[in-house]
Amino acid sequence: EFPLTPTTKTSEDSFMKSHGRAVQPFVPDAKVIFDPTGKAKTSLEEIGKYTINMYRESPYITDANTSMPELELGSAHKLKKFCPTIHKLMHHMLGNGNEEFERFINWLAFIYQTKEKAQTAWVLTGIQGTGKGLFYTEILKPLFGDQHVPMRTLENLEEKFNIYMRSAMFLVLDEFHMGSSKERKLADKLKNIITERTVVVRAMHNNQIEQKSYTNVIVLTNKVDAVSLEQTDRRYNVAPRQEHKLIDVHPEIIDELSNISKELLNFAGVLNNFKYQERLVKTVFQNQAKETMRNLAMEMSEQFAMHILTGNLEYFIDILDIETNNI
């Protein structure tokens, strides 16, 4: 497919000639949008009012097995019966956290059904080989569509141009570590991507445009201190860290990976019928994994201030034991 970018009549003539097509005497203007909700559709019926929606529904969404049972928070684990390989991979990737698995499925179901922004993000952390990459390539991208699930690195996020955000339902940040950023305002930029209802898209040699944002963020990382978290953070869910490789715990997974594409229609049906709780989509889960990452990502001065504010005097015991003549 060719990208939809603004162009001139001269460029269009050259394009047609390059591909052995007849040059058109008149090419009508069209408004190019991205709206996965279906509220705005592609319309080429009336010249002067042409609209092209860049959203493309994946075959798995189109042909989802909607006869799947209606699950809800607390019973999401029952999808194991219909998508055993997908369940095995995702549960392991989420650090075997049962409640985190339930909440992650609830979060995905909200996005699947509404195609809207959740305004909260997930951080998935663990050593290499825990299934994070497989989840992206074998489940998330095929299910929601390759062009709607871009993967980018920290360096990409620091760049000025972000055309990939134009049609992104998910932004997956790979090998992410906020502390390695050269950009001071990276935390604020990421907060805006997660929560703001609009996004400014900048493409090279084109004017920037502001459009509605449908982007949800998933962070994949090996780092234990990947994201700097405020004490009152309301944006990030953190799954328990997985310290064991998927293949070591489930050696049979090698022979089962080919089942994922067959299970995706059932998984799409589960998400389609899931009775999601929007309140738990919009509010983050305060678990031990998040508290651990918050503490590990803190600078020493932040730790000092936090322990004073919380009255944790034990933190200062080592300091009181220091011999003053050694200072």
Feature annotation, model-predicted:
Residues E1-G74:
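Intein modules and their embedded homing endonuclease domains
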Residues T42-F176, R184-A187, N237, L271:
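P-loop NTPase catalytic core of nucleic-acid-dependent motor ATPases
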Residues Q128, E278-I327:
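DNA transaction DNA-binding modules
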Residues F161-R166, R202-L220:
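AAA+/SF3 P-loop NTPase mechanochemical coupling elements
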Residues S167-M169, S213-N216, Q231-Y236:
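Short glycine-/polar-rich loops that comprise or flank the Walker A/P-loop
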Residues E175-H177, R197, V224:
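Conserved Walker B
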Residues L186-I209:
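Conserved catalytic/switch belt of AAA+ P-loop NTPases
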Residues V227-L246:
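A short helix-turn-beta junction within AAA+ P-loop NTPase domains corresponding to the substrate/partner-engaging
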